[in-house]
């Protein structure tokens, strides 16, 4: 069973905006002739890397909800120009919307088990919820209607 990470998407207002950020980074990489992979740099290197690489994803918390995920394809520890240890979380450049679930803010990243992870939004009734404008979806959820 794969292990996942969960992290706040700081400064991101919606899944659509996150997808836009990833698309911009991929366009820049394409222009520079670099590999098409989405990289997020973090200060701490996950110790359970083999479990994460066995099908794990990085789940993104956007505006207080677990809202999307990206599949982790590599974990690359490195030292920055000041000699400080960092880590590149390399992900497939495909943002997958998940069934929204409330999540309080926290710092850094955390491990996230498979049984705690929300399901992907598929081609079902949940997909119509994903198609709603996010403010409407949040309001309906706050009212207990979703």
Predicted regions mapped to residue ranges:
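Short, solvent-exposed amphipathic alpha-helical segments in soluble enzyme
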Residues: 23-24, 76
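Positively charged, polar, low-complexity stretches
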Residues: 8, 18, 35, 39, ...
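Short, extreme N-terminal leader segments that mark the start of a protein/domain
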Residues: 1-23
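Well-ordered alpha/beta subsegment
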Residues: 108-113, 119-146
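Ordered hydrophobic segments in well-structured contexts
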Residues: 4-9, 58-60, 69-71, 88-90, ...
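Aromatic- and Lys/Arg-enriched surface recognition patch
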Residues: 71-118
């Amino acid at each position: 069973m794969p292990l996942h990470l969960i992290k706040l998407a700081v400064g991101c207002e919606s899944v659509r905006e996150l997808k836009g950020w990833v698309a911009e980074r991929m366009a820049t990489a394409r222009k520079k002739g670099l590999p098409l992979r989405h990289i997020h740099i973090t200060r701490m290197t996950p110790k359970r890397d083999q479990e994460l690489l066995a099908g794990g994803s990085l789940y993104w918390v956007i505006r207080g909800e677990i809202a999307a995920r990206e599949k982790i394809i590599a974990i690359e520890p490195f030292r920055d120009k000041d000699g400080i240890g960092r880590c590149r979380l390399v992900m497939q450049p495909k943002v997958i919307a998940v069934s929204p679930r409330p999540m309080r803010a926290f710092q850094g990243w955390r491990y996230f088990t498979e049984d705690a992870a929300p399901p992907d939004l598929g081609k079902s009734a949940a997909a119509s919820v994903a198609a709603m404008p996010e403010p409407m979806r949040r309001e309906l959820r706050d009212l207990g209607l979703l």
